[in-house]
Amino acid sequence: MADITRLKGELRTEFGKGASRRLRRDFRVPAVVYGNDLDPMHVHVDILEFQAILRNEGVNAVLELEIEGQDHLVMIKAVDQNVLTLDVDHADLLNVKRGEKVEVDVPVIFTGQAAPGALVTQEADVITILADVLNIPEEITVDVEGKEIGDQVLAGDLQMPGNASLVSEEDTLIINVVEPEEEELPETDEEGEGAEGEAAEAAEGESAEGESEE
């Protein structure tokens, strides 16, 4: 695994919604550190540094969090984001140990092209696995190259990276290859078109008669 990202935090001295809002105005993210017999610690970290970690490493990122001169190995377990700005409002940080295995949700993506005339639908975007805390995969890839209509990929068919193991049910449907539904084309109203044509012809005939009378 690459070098572990370091992040410095500070213990919170004020609590409540008002205190959290003041922290966010000062570009700090309120967070709680818990797990492995550690008494929960309420801290705050720099919002720009934390959001950069999320962008580059995602949720499940593992980092060294320094609090009052002491390092804690933590994993980003969950984040609450503002629905409008997408800024992080709060974070849950799980205290972990080297060599420990943790349950994490990992995205599943597919690559390749199915057989001509077949449509690939993805039924599950994430699966839960058990992985070494320092070797959590960013994603799991499924190759659908050449798959035919009726083919399926279940969670149990996925290749687990490294020493990771599947936690999700093995029969969880991940990929389903189906026949595309034909688009319904609007029906031509032949009777209506005929009536319109007759009306147009009648109008032309009346116009011609009027000109001849003149």
UniProtKB/Swiss-Prot annotation:
SUPFAM superfamilies: Ribosomal protein L25-like (SSF50715). The gene is rplY. This is Large ribosomal subunit protein bL25. Pfam families: Ribosomal_L25p, Ribosomal_TL5_C. CDD domains: Ribosomal_L25_TL5_CTC. NCBIfam families: bL25_bact_ctc, PRK05618.2-1. Belongs to the bacterial ribosomal protein bL25 family. CTC subfamily. Keywords: Ribonucleoprotein, Ribosomal protein, RNA-binding, rRNA-binding. It comes from Corynebacterium jeikeium (strain K411). It comes from the Bacteria. The lineage of its organism: Bacteria, Bacillati, Actinomycetota, Actinomycetes, Mycobacteriales. The keyword Ribosomal protein applies. Signal peptide: none annotated. GO terms for biological process: translation. GO terms for molecular function: 5S rRNA binding; structural constituent of ribosome. GO terms for cellular component: cytosolic large ribosomal subunit.
